């Protein structure tokens, strides 16, 4: 009975540790900041990370996460360009197109309805 209890506690402990580990892995931590400019065509999106090390995390179209200095000129220019691009795309999807339909031309005939 003791062995079964110990085994159950070990399984619960492993499950808890693994679930905590998964959450930590999803968080991006910047250890260093890239100084070399990234071509804007390769950047898909970005997030701003506040904390011990401030950083802008660019996500490339291939899914790579690159940490950059938020005060660098090229970083600010990339953010501005991405914001304009996203705003333009958002406006494109939010607009509705109205297509005029043809209204039949009435004739001088009179229709009588009985009922």
Curated annotation (Swiss-Prot):
Q: What is this protein called?
A: Viral Lymphotactin
Q: Which InterPro entries match?
A: Chemokine_b/g/d (IPR039809), Chemokine_IL8-like_dom (IPR001811), Chemokine_XCL1/XCL2 (IPR008105), Interleukin_8-like_sf (IPR036048)
Indicate the family of this protein: Belongs to the intercrine gamma family.
Q: Which GO terms describe its cellular component?
A: extracellular space
Q: What subcellular locations does the record give?
A: Secreted
Its source organism is Rat cytomegalovirus (isolate England)
- PTM characteristics: N-glycosylated and O-glycosylated.
Q: Span of the secretion signal?
A: 1-19
| Keywords of this entry | Chemotaxis, Cytokine, Disulfide bond, Glycoprotein, Host-virus interaction, Secreted, Signal
Database matches in PANTHER family: CYTOKINE SCM-1 BETA-RELATED (PTHR12015:SF101), SMALL INDUCIBLE CYTOKINE A (PTHR12015)
Reported function: Chemoattractant for CD4-dendritic cells, but not for CD4+ dendritic cells, T-cells or B-cells.
- Which GO molecular function annotation, any one, does this entry have? chemokine activity
Q: Tell me the gene name.
A: vXCL1
Which cysteines share a disulfide bond?
A: 30-67
Concerning Gene3D superfamilies, the annotation shows: 2.40.50.40
| Self-association and partners | Interacts with host XCR1.
GO biological processes: antimicrobial humoral immune response mediated by antimicrobial peptide; chemokine-mediated signaling pathway; positive regulation of cell migration
